[in-house]
């Protein structure tokens, strides 16, 4: 029997200003869905896998074809419903309603675990959407680069006087998310040694200029890191190996990195983490014929790696969990102090979330990189005093290779996002841009996620696991007129550990789009300020007052 999730065809998004659908509001999700499966974007496009273990864009290839066909015929007063990657219905709504509403991998809490999900997955009854895979707004490794850069810069501020020159970062994983780490480290001024078990992933990062060099030798990797740091150079190297083996070996040798983290796909113990002593080929085969053995061995190996990370932490080296739930896996394997070192959000990012600042991103549907150059210039024009952001845009232009449709990630917050959206829409209207653009974000944002081991770890009021907030975010973005809205479960940290929402809005140059953009790009980050203000963060409370938010039970207005 053929595998409905495997097909050797090559998918790439259309370019240019000619429509394949009835309007840009349906052309936009069509192009972004196809862009998610571009071979220059996706991790395993022939299997519909975009990134993050088994994060898919559609449930099966038949479902992909049905979604494409439906989007091509969808009217501007209709909404397509997508249930875990399957197009299940089209309903009459209105022109300001979303054209697509997506729900991926959501399970009733008692059954929200990998065992139950995997059973459904085998029967083609569910699909793991990760965050931006199943919501059709993945832009390649760039999508996480700036967030990783901001994290490393803040770590440098807190621990090394704001200067990472001559320092180096140890990490693991060069997949769709982890692949951003070497480039982010170099942009922040540090060297990076990234351990990756799958050589094809390291080669992908070499090809797209996210990592500088590759080796199979730990000794060679350490020698290069030593030479670069002594010379004050910021460069990166991928070491082909298993993080569960390399991290303890470095501890044993007494090697002391300046920062330690990890972005292996530890959230998925079957598909995301190579067990100690296994070959990649053996691992891939046993994922299909003996997944329980894979999970058992992977979890035991994660415990070994986290123990090494604890050893680094106890030696005084700044060490953080980068949101893959590896500490939780180690805790469940009996490592009682697995959470002794913090996650990256409470350690470095939460003050940004308090002001609604997060991973704002946009993509040029024209396919022309010049459209991104023009929008970069517009960001600088509208935010003239944000020199940190200008520096980021300059580095991004120089260092980041586009994957698929040209795109840009740019962390901005409440008060700025809607201004940029309106300006971009005006650029489409007056012909400065060759075609419309879409604006979206990661689900990792200030008001759109509940994830107690990542984005909402150690909330001030103890509300880490309250998931009303992403539900409200999705509802508000739907009411505000986003072009498509998604509500997912399990992204980043795995089944049972997160709920999160996403939105994308199309700048098609119309006055109707102006009104939608102003609502969506104000309300979306405002929910993040509201959520953090409700938790008692002074920065969020002050920002809510400054921006004039009406929060009756929080501000009494």
Curated annotation (Swiss-Prot):
NAD(+) binds at residues 52-53, 130, 176-178, 196, 201, 242-243, 263-267, 273-274, 322, 492. GO terms for biological process: L-histidine catabolic process to glutamate and formamide; L-histidine catabolic process to glutamate and formate. The active site is at residue 410. Keywords: Cytoplasm, Histidine metabolism, Lyase, NAD. Pathway: Amino-acid degradation; L-histidine degradation into L-glutamate; N-formimidoyl-L-glutamate from L-histidine: step 2/3. Its EC number is 4.2.1.49. GO terms for molecular function: urocanate hydratase activity. One of its GO terms (cellular component) is cytoplasm. Residues 1-20 are annotated as: Disordered. Its cofactor is NAD(+). It is an enzyme of class 4 (lyase). It catalyses: 4-imidazolone-5-propanoate = trans-urocanate + H2O. It comes from the Bacteria. SUPFAM superfamilies: Urocanase. Its main location: cytoplasm. Disulfide bonds: none annotated. Binds 1 NAD(+) per subunit. It is found in: Cytoplasm. Belongs to the urocanase family. Catalyzes the conversion of urocanate to 4-imidazolone-5-propionate. HAMAP family: HutU (MF_00577). This is Urocanate hydratase. It comes from Brucella suis (strain ATCC 23445 / NCTC 10510).
């Amino acid at each position: 029997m053929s595998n409905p999730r495997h097909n050797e065809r090559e998918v790439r998004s259309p370019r240019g200003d000619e429509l394949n659908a009835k309007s840009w509001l349906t052309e936009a999700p069509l192009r972004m869905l196809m862009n998610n499966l571009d071979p220059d974007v996706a991790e395993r496009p022939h299997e519909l896998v975009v990134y993050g273990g088994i994060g898919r864009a559609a449930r099966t290839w038949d479902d992909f074809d049905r979604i494409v066909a439906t989007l091509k015929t969808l009217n501007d007063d209709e909404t397509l419903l997508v249930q875990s990657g399957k197009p299940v219905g089209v309903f009459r709504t209105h022109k300001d309603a979303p054209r697509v509403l997506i729900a991926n991998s959501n399970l009733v809490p008692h059954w929200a675990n990998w065992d139950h999900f995997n059973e459904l997955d085998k029967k083609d009854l569910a699909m793991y959407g990760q965050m931006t895979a199943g919501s059709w707004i993945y832009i390649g490794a760039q999508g996480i680069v700036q967030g990783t850069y901001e994290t490393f810069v803040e770590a440098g501020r807190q621990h090394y006087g704001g200067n990472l020159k001559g320092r180096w970062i140890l990490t693991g994983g060069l997949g769709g998310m982890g692949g951003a780490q070497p480039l982010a480290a170099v942009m922040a001024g540090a060297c990076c040694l990234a351990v990756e078990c799958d050589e094809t992933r390291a080669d992908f990062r070499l090809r797209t200029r996210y990592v500088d060099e590759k080796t199979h030798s730990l000794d060679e990797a350490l020698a290069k890191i030593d030479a670069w740091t002594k010379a004050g150079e910021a460069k990166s190297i991928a070491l082909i190996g298993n993080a569960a083996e390399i991290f303890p070996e470095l501890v044993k040798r007494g090697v002391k990195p300046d920062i330690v983290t990890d972005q292996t796909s530890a959230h998925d113990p079957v598909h995301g983490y190579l067990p100690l002593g296994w070959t990649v080929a053996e691992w891939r085969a046993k994922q299909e014929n003996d997944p329980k053995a894979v999970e058992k061995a992977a979890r035991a190996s994660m415990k070994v790696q986290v123990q090494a990370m604890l050893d680094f932490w106890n030696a005084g080296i700044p060490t953080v969990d980068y949101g893959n739930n590896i500490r939780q896996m180690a805790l469940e394997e009996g490592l009682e102090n697995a959470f002794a070192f913090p996650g990256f959000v409470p350690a470095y990012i939460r003050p940004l979330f308090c002001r609604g600042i997060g991973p704002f991103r946009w993509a040029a549907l024209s396919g022309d990189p010049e459209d991104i150059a023009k929008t970069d210039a517009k960001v600088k024009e509208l935010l003239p005093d944000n020199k940190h952001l200008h520096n980021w845009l300059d580095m991004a232009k120089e260092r980041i290779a586009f994957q698929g449709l040209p795109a840009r990630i740019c962390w901005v917050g409440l008060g700025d996002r809607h201004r940029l959206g309106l300006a971009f829409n005006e650029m489409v209207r007056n012909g400065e841009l060759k075609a419309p653009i879409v604006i979206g974000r990661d689900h990792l944002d200030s008001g759109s996620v509940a994830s107690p081991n990542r984005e909402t770890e150690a909330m001030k009021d103890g509300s880490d696991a309250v998931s009303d907030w992403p539900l409200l975010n999705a509802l508000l973005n739907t009411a505000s007129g986003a072009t498509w809205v998604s509500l997912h479960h399990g992204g980043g940290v795995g089944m049972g550990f997160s709920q999160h929402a996403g939105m994308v809005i199309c700048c098609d140059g119309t006055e109707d789009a102006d009104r939608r953009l102003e609502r969506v790009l104000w309300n979306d980050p405002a929910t993040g300020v509201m959520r953090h203000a409700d938790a008692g963060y002074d920065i969020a409370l002050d920002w809510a007052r400054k921006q004039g938010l009406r929060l009756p039970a929080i501000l009494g207005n």
